[in-house]
Amino acid sequence: MATQADLMELDMAMEPDRKAAVSHWQQQSYLDSGIHSGATTTAPSLSGKGNPEEEDVDTSQVLYEWEQGFSQSFTQEQVADIDGQYAMTRAQRVRAAMFPETLDEGMQIPSTQFDAAHPTNVQRLAEPSQMLKHAVVNLINYQDDAELATRAIPELTKLLNDEDQVVVNKAAVMVHQLSKKEASRHAIMRSPQMVSAIVRTMQNTNDVETARCTAGTLHNLSHHREGLLAIFKSGGIPALVKMLGSPVDSVLFYAITTLHNLLLHQEGAKMAVRLAGGLQKMVALLNKTNVKFLAITTDCLQILAYGNQESKLIILASGGPQALVNIMRTYTYEKLLWTTSRVLKVLSVCSSNKPAIVEAGGMQALGLHLTDPSQRLVQNCLWTLRNLSDAATKQEGMEGLLGTLVQLLGSDDINVVTCAAGILSNLTCNNYKNKMMVCQVGGIEALVRTVLRAGDREDITEPAICALRHLTSRHQEAEMAQNAVRLHYGLPVVVKLLHPPSHWPLIKATVGLIRNLALCPANHAPLREQGAIPRLVQLLVRAHQDTQRRTSMGGTQQQFVEGVRMEEIVEGCTGALHILARDVHNRIVIRGLNTIPLFVQLLYSPIENIQRVAAGVLCELAQDKEAAEAIEAEGATAPLTELLHSRNEGVATYAAAVLFRMSEDKPQDYKKRLSVELTSSLFRTEPMAWNETADLGLDIGAQGEPLGYRQDDPSYRSFHSGGYGQDALGMDPMMEHEMGGHHPGADYPVDGLPDLGHAQDLMDGLPPGDSNQLAWFDTDL
């Protein structure tokens, strides 16, 4: 029966795959019962095969390999010899698999493994046994380490307090080695005396190696909450802050990483670091060149500065903004750039740090990373740029940044588009060069497309409309920009934004843009066809009613609705209608909406700028005889005559022009008396020539302030939390705005006017047909 024994041994050695047996049975069209193959018995499928999970077996490959294994023939003597070898070495094979350390060196054991990809049963069983053995060994070692540390800690504590520095050094080295093992590390952190001794030794030693070992020990302890608490209670934070002045890099690394762990996870650590002067030390370390060290240091600064104004001011006083900007300009390590941008983002909402960052070149340095593959870095840079942008309207060398921002308007990321639009809005405000640059790189088309894509997302549409408003006034490319908005199909969506659900800040911005677009005669008809005029009148009436209602209730403060004063809406809508009224067809529409009584009433406004725009629109309407008669019929003569004495030359000139146009059908004697009155009023300071009055600010002045961001917001300020214009709409930078000015009386005497001797000169003194250089809707003074 030797042959049978041989085959049994070979069968044990080969360990044929169960799938091979299953496949063999299925080749004979039998169902596998599981007895021969060992396969799990399952109900036969409809196909007549066995386990459905094994239907993908390549039986031909299995049978081919099986046949290959027996391609060599053996004699009975050879089989008996092989059987004997396997029988004698079976115990060694098991021992080699499960307890390899017990074998004699050099012992040769025949393997039963024919295929290296398929381990034998013994090898498979050995894996869990090895894991169990290692677990037992680790447990024994852990217990040994813990017992050793527990016995050694009291003695080591005494040695750390020894007067002999050599002894202290040896003890510090030993404690450092113990802290590398988990069991002894826990024993150390549970001994307050030991932790205090480590802190004291680190703080007082002059030996570099002792400082390195003690700092390394605290670093190892700081990976556990229990260790962090022990360090904190032992006064470790002041000692670690002191070590930030060490000239040894390894000590610096241990100190900053330990402090970083404390700041992240230990309550009270932030205040302790601040009190120990940690901020000043950390800022001083920003001139190091190790990027990973700098990344940890800047992250510590961010943790300390976030939500703490005093920390932000300390960083400023220590020269932090310049150092942080230098990092952004110098390095390429993504994590360092990200942590540094986070610090700058926190500092950028501080009114003191903001100009310092801008002056250090922060705008340009942050702009270098707007095309980085790291989205978290790009987003932080954009947030920071947006916070800084209202303080950077006078910065030079912004061409690259502006071009990148225009490109980012096409991003699919809503946050990126929102930030890019807000930054462009601020940087184009009252900055001639920036306006030119944005127009030259396709900014008008990009902004119009952004508004079209944004739909009702006002956090995008409002800054985009503000940017368009800035770009359509007061620079050489303004007329091109006014045309470009129309050519890129922007007029319909702009007029649509005057309607619900737009909120007042967006409406205010849109009114200003329409006013600037109306400076281009080619836009008059399209704006009229889109229904801009009736909507402007509706908004004007509503805002005026709100102001009148408040006044009748005894209110003295200007009313804010969603951060916008209703007086701003009154002034803005009237100013837009003033420019639109330059077109004869628009004048007919405006007059047909019964607006003249309201415009006359606005002449009595205590706000000088509202007086000016009201007189301006009446001046345009009075070109038509019917309108001039209607203006006179509404009793406009008295307030207009009073406004002749206004300190604002623009108001006085418009009032004079309306009075003159109203007098065209009057007797010659009346005209002469009016002429003398106008001359004495308008030239009361000096006999200025009429052809010079176009520079007196007859058109509407500039408006508002930059799109700022709340200092109490760590990331960014909503456009709706106060609006982009913080001053009264239309405030002229060259004049003081007297909110409580005179109120013209309704019964101001008009008789006894002298001869009107300067009629033609008066008409020459009106604003030019294109007052593009005087456009007012350009925020941020």
Swiss-Prot record:
InterPro entries xrefs: ARM-like, ARM-type_fold, Armadillo, Beta-catenin
Modification Phosphotyrosine, positions: Y64, Y142, Y331, Y333
Intervals holding ARM repeats: 151-191, 193-234, 235-276, 277-318, 319-360, 361-389, 400-441, 442-484, 489-530, 531-571, 594-636, 637-666
Modified residues (S-nitrosocysteine): C619
Effect of D32G: In PTR and hepatocellular carcinoma
Phenotypic consequence of K435E: Abolishes TCF7L2 binding
Glycan-bearing residues: S23
Domain of life where this protein originates: Eukaryota
Residue segments, region Interaction with BCL9: 156-178
Residues bearing the modification Phosphoserine: S23, S29, S33, S37, S45, S191, S246, S552, S675
Record key words, sorted: Acetylation, Activator, Cell adhesion, Cell junction, Cell membrane, Cell projection, Chromosomal rearrangement, Cytoplasm, Cytoskeleton, Disease variant, Glycoprotein, Host-virus interaction, Intellectual disability, Membrane, Neurogenesis, Nucleus, Phosphoprotein, Repeat, S-nitrosylation, Synapse, Transcription, Transcription regulation, Ubl conjugation, Wnt signaling pathway
SMART domains: ARM
Cellular location(s): Cytoplasm; Nucleus; Cytoplasm, Cytoskeleton; Cell junction, Adherens junction
Stated consequence of mutating S37Y: In hepatocellular carcinoma
Effect of W383A: Abolishes APC binding. Strongly reduces phosphorylation and degradation
Effect of K435A: Strongly reduces or abolishes LEF1 binding
Mutagenesis / variant outcome for changing Y142E: No effect on interaction with BCL9 and BCL9L
Modified residues (Phosphothreonine): T41, T556
Interaction with VCL: annotated segments: 2-23
Biased composition (Basic and acidic residues): 734-745
Function of the molecule: Key downstream component of the canonical Wnt signaling pathway. In the absence of Wnt, forms a complex with AXIN1, AXIN2, APC, CSNK1A1 and GSK3B that promotes phosphorylation on N-terminal Ser and Thr residues and ubiquitination of CTNNB1 via BTRC and its subsequent degradation by the proteasome. In the presence of Wnt ligand, CTNNB1 is not ubiquitinated and accumulates in the nucleus, where it acts as a coactivator for transcription factors of the TCF/LEF family, leading to activate Wnt responsive genes. Also acts as a coactivator for other transcription factors, such as NR5A2.
Family per record: Belongs to the beta-catenin family.
Assembly notes: Two separate complex-associated pools are found in the cytoplasm. The majority is present as component of an E-cadherin:catenin adhesion complex composed of at least E-cadherin/CDH1 and beta-catenin/CTNNB1, and possibly alpha-catenin/CTNNA1; the complex is located to adherens junctions. The stable association of CTNNA1 is controversial as CTNNA1 was shown not to bind to F-actin when assembled in the complex. Alternatively, the CTNNA1-containing complex may be linked to F-actin by other proteins such as LIMA1. (Microbial infection) Interacts with herpes virus 8 protein vPK; this interaction inhibits the Wnt signaling pathway.
Connected disease: Colorectal cancer: A complex disease characterized by malignant lesions arising from the inner wall of the large intestine (the colon) and the rectum. Genetic alterations are often associated with progression from premalignant lesion (adenoma) to invasive adenocarcinoma. Risk factors for cancer of the colon and rectum include colon polyps, long-standing ulcerative colitis, and genetic family history.
The protein's name: Catenin beta-1
Source organism of the structure: Homo sapiens
